[in-house]
Amino acid sequence: MPFEIVFEGAKEFAQLIETASRLIDEAAFKVTEEGISMRAMDPSRVVLIDLNLPSSIFSKYEVDGEETIGVNMDHLKKVLKRGKAKDTLILRKGEENFLEISLQGTATRTFRLPLIDVEEIEVELPDLPYTAKVVVLGEVLKEAVKDASLVSDSIKFMAKENEFIMRAEGETQEVEVKLTLEDEGLLDIEVQEETKSAYGVSYLADMVKGIGKADEVTMRFGNEMPMQMEYYIRDEGRLTFLLAPRVEE
C-alpha cells in the first residue's frame, strides 16, 4: 500500500526514533489512516515501548488503508540523524519493499531503506493500580538520572503528599533530588499512599534521551510496581514506556 507522510522538523522525529533505538533493535510500525503506531519490548523484556502518532501532527498524511512496515532501528536512526532542525521529513512507500526517506532543506536528500520482517507483539498496556502520579519537567528528570548514574545502577522513586524524591545510594556515595509543588520542576503530584519503588538507571537514561528540557513528563508508579512514563509529542502524539521495577533485597 503506497503512502506519503510529511513531518515538519526532521530533527524532532529523529530524536523519537533515537530514543526507541536505544532499547530495541527492530520495530514494526503500523501505518493506518488514523496515524502511526508502534509497540515493542526490549530484548531483556524489562521495558515496553508504546508510540502513537496521530495523523494530525503531520503536515501531510496520505494513507489509504493499513500496512505494517518492519525496520532496523539502528539503520533508521542513522538516516534520520542526517536531518537538520528545519528540514522537512518525507516518508514514502510505493509498491516495492523499501521505505523512502527524504530530508528537504537547502537540498533534497533521499535514502531508501529496505523493509524487514518483524514479528508484531500482542501485548496490551496493563491497567495497574498505581498509587502515585507525578508530573515533572523533562530537565529535572534528565538531570536526576545523570546524578544517580554517578553513584548507583538503581534509583528509588518516593512519593508522598506534596513531595517527590529521587534517591540513589552507592557503597560510599548517595544523591537525593527532592521536589515539592513550590519548586518549578514539579508540576503536579497525586498520591493515594506513601509510595516507593526502585528502577534501573541505565534503562531510565535511555528512556529520557529524547525528552526536551521543557517537556512535561508524567510518571505513574506503585510500591515495587512497574512505572509508566509518558510524554507528548506536539500535544497529540504520545510516547509511553512501562519499566519493570528493581526489586531490592
Curated annotation (Swiss-Prot):
Keywords carried by this UniProt record: DNA replication, DNA-binding
Record's keyword annotation contains DNA-binding: yes
Database matches in PROSITE patterns: PCNA_1 (PS01251)
GO MF assignments: DNA binding; DNA polymerase processivity factor activity
InterPro entries: DNA_clamp_sf, Pr_cel_nuc_antig, Pr_cel_nuc_antig_C, Pr_cel_nuc_antig_CS, Pr_cel_nuc_antig_N
Entry keyword DNA-binding: yes
Any one of the GO BP annotations: leading strand elongation
Pfam families: PCNA_C (PF02747), PCNA_N (PF00705)
Binding partners and assembly: Homotrimer. The subunits circularize to form a toroid; DNA passes through its center. Replication factor C (RFC) is required to load the toroid on the DNA.
Function recorded in the entry: Sliding clamp subunit that acts as a moving platform for DNA processing. Responsible for tethering the catalytic subunit of DNA polymerase and other proteins to DNA during high-speed replication.
The family this protein is said to belong to: Belongs to the PCNA family.
Protein name (record): DNA polymerase sliding clamp
Organism phylogeny: Archaea, Methanobacteriati, Methanobacteriota, Thermococci, Thermococcales
Gene label: pcn
